[in-house]
Design a protein with these regions (language model features):
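Histidine-rich, glycine-flanked metal-binding segment
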Residues: 1-52, 424
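Histidine/acidic residue-rich metal-binding segments in metalloenzymes
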Residues: 130-298
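A glycine-rich helix N-cap at a beta->alpha junction
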Residues: 108-124
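His/Asp/Glu-enriched, well-ordered alpha-helical/loop segment
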Residues: 197-223, 292-298, 303-376
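Divalent metal-coordination and catalytic microenvironments
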Residues: 9, 22, 27, 47, ...
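C-terminal cap of metal-dependent C-N hydrolases
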Residues: 9, 313, 367-433
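Divalent metal-binding segments
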Residues: 60-69, 88-100, 120-131, 147-158, ...
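Metal-associated gating/positioning segment near the N- to mid-region
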Residues: 46-113
C-alpha cells in the first residue's frame, strides 16, 4: 500500500504544469501519472498547484545564544507554516558556528526539534582556514558564510588577505554578506540618531558594490564559487550580470516588495536590515534583474529581533526582520501580478539552490526523489497578521498586507507537516545531503 497520493492537482514538472497524480512510498516519490493503487492518505489537490518542496537558502534561527528571539524549533515552525520544506541556517550565533565542535552541537540541537529539513553554514573567521579546507563531506554543511562587512554577530572578516585565505581554502560554496567594512567605518559620521532614513546613507550603494567587486575578483582568482547574498543595488545587478559562471547571487523578497523612503516612513526601525532597503531606482533595477534571470536565488534572510529591541532609538536598534514564513506568499503574489513567472520562481527556490549547492534528491518532482512538496492555491488571498507569525519575534513587516497565492500544504518525506495553516506531526526533519 502507498503512503500518500496527491490527486487532481496541477504538478510542476520539467518546467510545466501537468495534470497528473503523485504517489509516495517510504518518503520517496514512487510514481507520477495515473495511480490505481490504494494509499493510507489522499490529498485532493483540485484547484491547487503542486510544487517541489521550496528551499530557503538564508535563515537566522538565533540558536545558540539568542533563543528568546528564535530557536531552531520555532524557526522551523515558521518555515513549514510558509510552505518551506528545507532551510539553510546561518552561523552568526553565540558562540558562532565556526569550528567543528560548534557545528556538531548545532546538528545535535536540530535533531528531533526541527520540522523542516536543514543544513548549516560554517562561519569563516580570520583564523579557521584549516577547517574551511575540510568541509567537503561534513554532514549537514551547505557552505561557508563570510561576513565581509559587520552585521549581527562577531564573524567579521574584513581584511583582503584574510578574505583571500578563506577563498583559497574553501571546500564549499562561499556565501557572502557583501559590504565594505572600511566604507562602513568612514560613513558612520552620516548616521543621524533617531533617523532610520539614514540607514541606507550609512550603508551606501558604494559600500555594497565596492565589496562585491572585490569578492568577485578574489573568487575568480582562486576559481572558487561565491554566492553573494541579499543584493540591493542597481550597480551590483549591472556588474554581476556580467560576471556569472562561478558567481551566483540572491535577492530577498523584502527588497522586491518594499522600498525607501516609504518603508521607513511606515515601519520605522522595523524596516532596518543589512544591507538596507533602498530607494525605488534600486528596487526597479532588482526587478529588472529578476525579469532577465540575472539572480539565481530568492532567500528570505529571516533575521528576527524582539519588538522591544527593534523599537530602540536608531542606530541602537538591531538590523533584521523575519521572512521565512512570508517568502512564498509574497513571491506568489508577485507571480499573480505578472512580475515574474511561476517557472522563474521555481528556478529561484527549488532548482537553482539544488544546482548551486549540490543538494541531493530535492527541488524536482521526479520518481525516486524525496517526497517534499509545497502545495499552493494561486487564487487564495490571505492577510498576513502579526498574530499568525510562528517566529518568536511575533511580528512581520507585512502585517495587514494582503497577498494572492499562498501555500496550503507543506509535505516533507511524504508526511503532511502543515495543512491550511495548521502545523501537524512531529519535528522530525533531517539534515540535507550534498554531492
Amino acid at each position: 500500500m502507498l503512503d500518500l497520493i496527491i490527486k487532481n492537482g496541477q504538478c510542476y514538472i520539467d518546467g510545466e504544469l501537468k495534470d497528473v497524480d503523485v504517489a509516495v512510498k517510504d518518503g520517496k516519490i514512487h510514481k507520477i501519472g495515473e495511480i490505481s493503487e490504494e494509499a493510507k492518505e489522499i490529498i485532493n489537490a483540485e484547484g491547487k498547484t503542486v510544487l517541489p518542496g521550496c528551499i530557503d537558502t538564508q535563515t537566522h534561527f538565533r540558536e545558540p545564544g539568542s533563543t528568546d528571539t528564535e530557536d531552531l524549533h520555532s524557526g522551523s515552525r515558521a518555515a513549514i507554516a510558509g510552505g518551506i520544506t528545507s532551510v539553510f541556517e546561518m552561523p552568526n550565533t553565540n558562540p558562532p558556528t565556526s569550528n567543528m565542535k560548534e557545528f556538531q552541537r548545532k546538528l545535535d540541537l536540530a535533531k528531533n526539534r526541527m520540522y523542516c529539513n536543514y543544513a548549516f553554514y560554517f562561519g569563516a573567521t580570520a583564523d579557521n582556514a584549516n577547517d574551511l579546507a575540510s568541509l567537503k563531506d561534513l554532514e549537514g554543511c551547505c557552505g561557508i558564510k563570510l561576513f565581509a562587512g559587520s552585521s549581527t554577530g562577531n564573524l567579521l572578516v574584513a581584511e583582503e588577505d584574510d578574505i583571500d585565505k578563506v577563498f583559497q581554502n574553501a571546500s564549499k560554496v562561499v556565501a557572502v554578506h557583501s559590504e565594505d567594512e572600511a566604507i562602513l567605518n568612514v560613513n558612520k559620521k552620516l548616521i543621524k540618531e533617531g533617523d532610520v532614513h539614514t540607514h541606507p546613507v550609512w550603508r551606501s550603494a558604494e559600500c555594497a558594490i565596492s565589496s562585491t567587486r572585490r569578492i568577485v575578483r578574489i573568487a575568480n582568482r582562486h576559481k572558487k564559487k561565491a554566492h553573494i547574498l541579499h543584493i540591493t543595488t542597481k550597480e551590483e545587478i549591472d556588474f554581476l550580470s556580467q560576471h556569472k559562471g562561478n558567481i551566483t547571487f540572491e535577492i530577498t523578497p523584502q527588497h522586491l516588495t518594499i522600498y525607501a523612503p516609504d518603508c521607513y516612513d511606515k515601519l520605522g526601525t522595523y524596516a532596518q536590515m543589512n544591507p538596507p532597503l533602498r530607494d525605488k531606482s534600486h528596487y526597479d533595477r532588482l526587478w529588472y534583474g529578476v525579469r532577465n534571470n540575472f539572480n539565481d536565488t530568492i532567500g528570505s534572510d529571516h533575521a528576527p529581533h524582539l519588538k522591544e529591541n527593534k523599537e530602540k532609538t536608531y542606530p541602537n536598534s538591531p538590523s533584521g526582520m523575519p521572512g521565512v514564513q512570508t517568502l512564498m506568499p509574497v513571491m506568489l503574489n508577485h507571480v499573480n501580478d505578472g512580475r515574474l513567472t511561476l517557472h522563474q520562481l521555481m528556478n529561484l527556490v527549488c532548482e537553482n539552490p539544488v544546482k548551486i549547492f549540490g543538494i541531493q534528491n530535492k527541488g524536482f518532482i521526479k520518481e525516486g526523489f524525496d517526497a517534499d512538496f509545497t502545495i499552493v492555491d494561486m487564487n487564495k488571498t490571505i492577510e498576513i497578521k502579526n498574530e499568525n507569525i510562528e517566529s518568536k519575534c511575533g511580528w512581520t513587516p507585512f502585517n495587514g498586507d494582503k497577498f494572492k497565492g499562498t501555500p496550503t500544504h507543506t509535505i516533507i518525506a511524504g508526511n503532511i507537516k502543515m495543512q491550511e495553516g495548521k502545523i501537524l506531526g512531529d519535528p522530525d526533519g533531517t539534515p540535507l545531503k550534498f554531492s
